[in-house]
Amino acid sequence: MSQLCPCGSAVEYSLCCHPYVSGEKVAPDPEHLMRSRYCAFVMKDADYLIKTWHPSCGAAALRAELIAGFAHTEWLGLTVFEHCWQDVDNIGFVSFVARFTEGGKTGAIIERSRFLKENGQWYYIDGTRPQFGRNDPCPCGSGKKFKKCCGQ
């Protein structure tokens, strides 16, 4: 039985993010890396998350924290609403909303992630959290106001 990819692509997982998470392939661009990292959170794969963090971030030190977070967090969906990169600059950005429940409460991470390419491989380096007014349109594209959607 085929399983749709948790990244929201509407493609079978084995044909979408699995080749990246399993190490068969390297993500070709920041958007694919972002989507595969989301899948790693869903699948509780700390090794892939650490491997795809930029080496300067010292992600291995976060292993215990990541694993502890897996026990309390259920990921509900990912919406990528903006992505841009240039291989010439070796830098890229992906803006997304990741919805989750933790401790019985629903939440959302809204982030503009920054990625760096080194030696032919993209890495997550950091992200910023844009600020939205309660009456602004939600960045997830639902058409609702932020306060009635991801801002709850």
Swiss-Prot record:
Matching SUPFAM superfamilies: NTF2-like, Sec-C motif
Family membership noted in the UniProt record: Belongs to the UPF0225 family.
Protein name (Swiss-Prot/TrEMBL): UPF0225 protein YchJ
